[in-house]
């Protein structure tokens, strides 16, 4: 069995009772350290509150077959910062498990994607589909990011811009801003009147 457990945005403080029960009764517990960054001491606090070992799971572990192989025979839980199914990575893991006949249980929780807009006073129905902003280089500078932002903008919608992670660290705010400005310039759609707000590891652009 595979439990995908969203633990929310406040570390152990946002664990639900059902999630805590699943955490305590699992044979193996992993903490996703690839798709999002939690509080610095989140792993230690989870271990203490559950009184058990919790294994950090990086990209290679999550995208490999190792977690699914365990889940074929044991009760396995994957702890996810935020909500359990916001990231494509976790949805793909769920589908792969189901294809193998593994029972999957999802534990929902709050994520930056579904709380950022309200946090800064925007209405949810005025927020369009999110877009990911990757680290760029001289050989990789995807302007499709701005295409998606512009599509939302032309529809009167704000855009959540999800900032990429690298080596366990968020892209600095200033770097993200400069990349967005350069992308707009290259696409010929530069508009300095647009506003970006930093919120919960995310931008809401509009």
Curated annotation (Swiss-Prot):
UniProt key word S-adenosyl-L-methionine: yes
Gene Ontology molecular function: diphthine synthase activity
Enzyme's top EC category: transferase
Domain of life: Archaea
Gene3D superfamilies recorded: Cobalt-precorrin-4 Transmethylase, Domain 1, Methyltransferase, Cobalt-precorrin-4 Transmethylase, Domain 2
Alphabetical keyword list: Methyltransferase, S-adenosyl-L-methionine, Transferase
Reactions it catalyzes: 2-[(3S)-amino-3-carboxypropyl]-L-histidyl-[translation elongation factor 2] + 3 S-adenosyl-L-methionine = diphthine-[translation elongation factor 2] + 3 S-adenosyl-L-homocysteine + 3 H(+)
Tagged with keyword S-adenosyl-L-methionine: yes
EC numbers on record: 2.1.1.98
GO terms (BP aspect): methylation; protein histidyl modification to diphthamide
Disulfide bonds: none
Pathway(s) served: Protein modification; peptidyl-diphthamide biosynthesis
Residue positions binding S-adenosyl-L-methionine: 9, 83, 86, 111-112, 163
PANTHER family: DIPHTHINE METHYL ESTER SYNTHASE (PTHR10882:SF0), DIPHTHINE SYNTHASE (PTHR10882)
Record-stated family: Belongs to the diphthine synthase family.
Function of the molecule: S-adenosyl-L-methionine-dependent methyltransferase that catalyzes the trimethylation of the amino group of the modified target histidine residue in translation elongation factor 2 (EF-2), to form an intermediate called diphthine. The three successive methylation reactions represent the second step of diphthamide biosynthesis.
Self-association state and partner proteins as the record states: Homodimer.
Protein known as: Diphthine synthase
Source organism per UniProt: Thermoplasma volcanium (strain ATCC 51530 / DSM 4299 / JCM 9571 / NBRC 15438 / GSS1)
